[in-house]
UniProtKB/Swiss-Prot annotation:
It catalyses: S-ubiquitinyl-[E2 ubiquitin-conjugating enzyme]-L-cysteine + [acceptor protein]-L-lysine = [E2 ubiquitin-conjugating enzyme]-L-cysteine + N(6)-ubiquitinyl-[acceptor protein]-L-lysine. Keywords: Endosome, Lipoprotein, Lysosome, Membrane, Metal-binding, Myristate, Transferase, Ubl conjugation pathway, Zinc, Zinc-finger. Pfam families: zf-RING_2 (PF13639). A zinc finger (RING-type) spans 152-193. Its EC number is 2.3.2.27. Residues 18-29 have a biased composition (Low complexity). The RING-type zinc finger domain is required for E3 ligase activity. PANTHER family: E3 UBIQUITIN-PROTEIN LIGASE ZNRF1 (PTHR46661:SF2), E3 UBIQUITIN-PROTEIN LIGASE ZNRF1-LIKE PROTEIN (PTHR46661). InterPro entries: Znf_RING, Znf_RING/FYVE/PHD, ZNRF_ubiq-protein_ligase. The gene is znrf1. Pathway: Protein modification; protein ubiquitination. Gene3D superfamilies: Zinc/RING finger domain, C3HC4 (zinc finger). This is E3 ubiquitin-protein ligase ZNRF1.
Amino acid sequence: MGGKQSSASRSRAPFPGVSSDDSAVPPSSNFGHFRAGGAMGLRSRSVSSVSGLDPPAPGLPFGLYRAGPDTERGGSSGSEDSRGDLYLGSRASLADTLQIAPRWIGAHSGFRCPICSKSVAPDEMEMHFIMCLSKPRLSYNDDVLTRDAGECVICLEELSQGDTIARLPCLCIYHKSCIDSWFEVNRCCPEHPSD
């Protein structure tokens, strides 16, 4: 019983031909953004400290870098370096890519409407903004609650007799102060956002 015994004939590396021993591949002097990390293996520093790599240009997918002129290596050891080509892989580690990803995704994910808080594609931004501004704000009747009526879904507190409430056209009721706060950000009923 118990776990499977490992055999000496089988490679312990996760992939055939790939060593899991960190000392098997010494860091190259050309890749200045890698440094030895003891038991953790090779670690990556911030992209801003990488010599020879310029920050990604706007519009470039994350993880792609331009190689600037590298005088430390005595000019160009390869034609790729002298042309300023894009690099992905050994020059752009996974850690570097993960640091850049949120900035790139945020720049390309669209626009957040300040009226309805929806995310809108850049090409639809103007039309959406006009539509949001021209959409009428919901009006409501304020009243004093005559009997207990359940829970306010905004603050999650009970609607008790004597509370000042707001009754929307869809007949939903909320604390008046809660719905006023809600309408500062949204223009719809919290329970019926598509109306």
